[in-house]
Curated annotation (Swiss-Prot):
Associated pathway: Capsule biogenesis; capsule polysaccharide biosynthesis
GO CC annotations on file: plasma membrane
Cellular compartment(s): Cell membrane
Topology in membrane: Multi-pass membrane protein
A Gene Ontology BP annotation from the UniProt entry: capsule polysaccharide biosynthetic process
Disulphide bonds in the chain: none
UniProt-listed CDD domains: UDP_invert_4-6DH_SDR_e (cd05237)
Origin: domain of life: Bacteria
Protein name, per record: Capsular polysaccharide biosynthesis protein CapD
Organism: Staphylococcus aureus
TM stretches of this protein: 12-32, 41-61, 79-99, 102-122
SUPFAM superfamilies registered for this protein in UniProt: NAD(P)-binding Rossmann-fold domains, S-adenosyl-L-methionine-dependent methyltransferases
Keywords linked to the UniProt accession: Capsule biogenesis/degradation, Cell membrane, Exopolysaccharide synthesis, Membrane, Transmembrane, Transmembrane helix
Function: Required for the biosynthesis of type 1 capsular polysaccharide.
Length: 599
């Protein structure tokens, strides 16, 4: 059953209350008519009009038109008493001032009684009707809410009001000891801490848990997820309460907890002042701007109010999409320029540099699909190595201040074409970082990003939706994971810290077993592992069981910021690197590529 809209509900209550107020006055008159001699009808009409106006004013003041009356309790009925009494007192005082006759007090007493009984009764009637006739007709699942703050309270009241959510809030838990035993509504109280959830789930037969604490730590979220995994309970997150209060999102816009939420980490506090100096009122160029990382870098850069962002990419559809998105959100204060260009075409790239003269370049354009590049090594070399060389040399010729290359953990001791090409691309930009250069060149290296195109998570999700099985290459295979927004924010921070020549390595946290990731995705999709199944297909060409973040020459990294490390790197001579690149393009062999990348 669809809930009545707020405006229609407000109008219905005004009409009902207007009828009740008028009826109360005339009913009082009918009861007291034998005693009403000597009083004019003007008193009756005037009393009705003043009481009607004052009732609506006090009903608004005491919030009678915006409460969830279907779950009214003592506090709601006290508001009715205050509104009714206040309106009667005001009416009595105004009538005394406006007419010469002394008010008939018995009339106002009877009117007050009828007014109170009928207004309160109308609200209680809706509560009874809703609970016994509507609620019983809709199956609602027992729900536990984590968090008894403002967000949790708003969410619980909305669940009680809404039939569409199909959730019945039973209790809340909160780690704040001051909130223990606190009553949120007549039917929902705080009955423990997060650690009590397993016991409470069994006791109250909980089917759903909703996280209503936006600042809940990653550790706590994973603990709750493990409980849900054991007990077979669905886990959701409510939207940020600020977005709810601003009207941007509805409180019932719940989101199932995804694997990205579980593998994410508590956010790093960025040095906003330092990054602002690098980005605010500047022209920024992002290559690969339509890709997963490139588009998120554009979003993050936009938050610092640059003057202009050049969105450069080879795929017209993805560039069009990110241009539309950013123009809609930030177009009133930032100029976004979509540029279709191939990084393999140096003449075109140099034209772009000379035309827009960017302050900084974030180079995210790359082929990153490991198995696919094993079949297309020449294209990987041209795009990842030659493309990086073209963009970096053009940036140097255009006297760009900062050049930040997005690299990968697969560039460390690479065993595949993709990783090897990214490692040599790092060598290219390190060779360009000369003492007399006006451009500072830096690489930022990190692992897999969650949800990026071609990554394992979308693949697993598709396999689960198709009924399985989920294919994992090896039971011991591990990977580092990071969310796209976190990686992009840390890229901006590393770029702001760069002096030139560094390879920055992002702290990826603990490596995750791919088989455990698959199991988590199956459970979060509401399926059972035995129904979907997991098959081991064997390691594919170029894959490693585990990834590294530093090679043997880069050990003992220096931490320069939270979750950002600077690896010790060697300097490369540009003429030698140029010869290596030319030789790989003209005389390719995989053995040669891997040998150079691993030296």
């Amino acid at each position: 059953m669809t809930s009545i809209s707020a405006k229609l509900r407000f109008l219905i209550l005004i009409i009902i209350d207007s009828f009740i107020v008028t009826f109360s006055v005339f009913l009082g008159y009918a009861i007291l008519e034998p005693y009403f001699k000597g009083y004019s009808i003007d008193l009756l009409v005037l009393s009705s009009v003043i009481l009607l106006v004052s009732h609506h004013i006090f009903a608004y003041v005491f919030n009678l038109y915006h409460r969830a009356w279907e779950y009214a309790s003592v506090s709601e009925l006290m508001s009715v008493l205050k509104a009714v009494t206040s309106s009667i007192v005001v009416t009595l005082l105004l009538v005394s001032l406006l007419i010469s006759e002394s008010p008939f007090l018995r009339l106002y007493f009877i009117t007050w009684m009828m007014h109170l009984l009928l207004i309160g009764g109308s609200r209680l009637f809706w509560r009874v009707y809703r609970r016994y006739f509507i609620d019983n007709a809709v199956e609602k699942k027992a729900t536990l809410v984590v968090g008894a703050g403002q967000g949790g309270s708003v969410l619980i009241r909305e669940m009680l009001r809404s039939q569409d959510m199909r959730m019945q809030p039973v209790l809340a838990v909160d780690d704040d000891k001051n909130k223990q035993k606190m009553t949120i509504t007549e039917r929902v109280k705080v009955q423990g801490y997060v650690e009590d959830i397993p016991e409470l789930v069994k006791k109250f037969r909980i089917k759903k848990i909703i996280i209503a604490i936006p600042t809940l730590s990653q550790k706590r979220l994973n603990e709750i997820n493990k409980i849900c995994n054991i007990e077979g309970v669905e886990l959701f997150k409510m939207p940020n309460i600020e977005d709810v209060l601003s009207g941007e999102l509805e409180v019932n816009n719940l989101k199932k907890v995804e694997v990205e939420d579980l593998l994410g980490r508590d956010p790093v506090e960025l040095d906003m002042a330092l990054i602002s100096r690098e980005l605010t009122n500047k022209t920024i160029l992002v290559t690969g701007a339509g890709g997963s990382i490139g588009s998120e870098i554009c979003r993050q850069v936009s938050k610092f109010d640059p003057q202009k962002i050049i969105l450069l990419g080879h795929g017209e559809n993805s560039i069009y999409s990110i241009h539309q998105e950013l123009s809609k959100t930030y177009g009133n204060r930032i100029e976004f320029v979509p540029v279709i260009a191939d990084v393999q075409n140096k003449t075109r790239i140099l034209e772009v540099m000379n035309e827009f003269k960017p302050y900084a370049v974030y180079h995210a354009a790359a082929h990153k699909h490991v198995p696919l590049m094993e079949y297309n090594p020449h294209e990987a070399i041209r795009n990842n190595i030659l493309g990086t060389k073209n963009v970096a040399e053009s940036a140097k010729e255009g006297e760009v201040s900062k050049f930040v290359m997005i690299s990968t953990d697969k560039a460390v001791n690479p065993s595949n074409v993709m990783g090897a090409t990214k490692r040599i691309a790092e060598m290219v930009i390190q060779s360009l970082n000369e003492d007399n250069s006006k451009t500072s060149f830096v690489a930022v290296r990190f692992g897999n990003v969650l949800g990026s195109r071609g990554s394992v998570i979308p693949l697993f999700k598709n396999q689960i939706e198709s009924g399985g099985p989920v294919t994992v290459t090896h039971p011991e295979m591990t990977r580092y994971f990071m969310t796209i927004p976190e990686a992009s924010r840390l890229v901006l921070q590393a770029g702001a810290l760069a002096q030139g020549g560094e390879v920055f390595v992002l702290d990826m946290g603990k490596p995750v077993k791919i088989v455990d990731l698959a199991k988590n995705l199956i459970r979060l999709s509401g399926k059972k592992e035995e129904d979907i199944g997991i098959e081991f297909s064997g390691i594919r060409p170029g894959e490693k069981l585990y990834e590294e973040l530093l090679n043997k020459n880069e050990i003992h990294p220096q931490q320069v910021y939270e979750k950002i490390y600077r690896g010790k790197v060697d300097h490369y001579i540009k003429t030698e690197v140029d010869l290596i690149v030319e030789d790989l393009i003209n005389n390719f062999s995989k053995e040669k590529l891997l040998k150079i990348a691993n030296r």
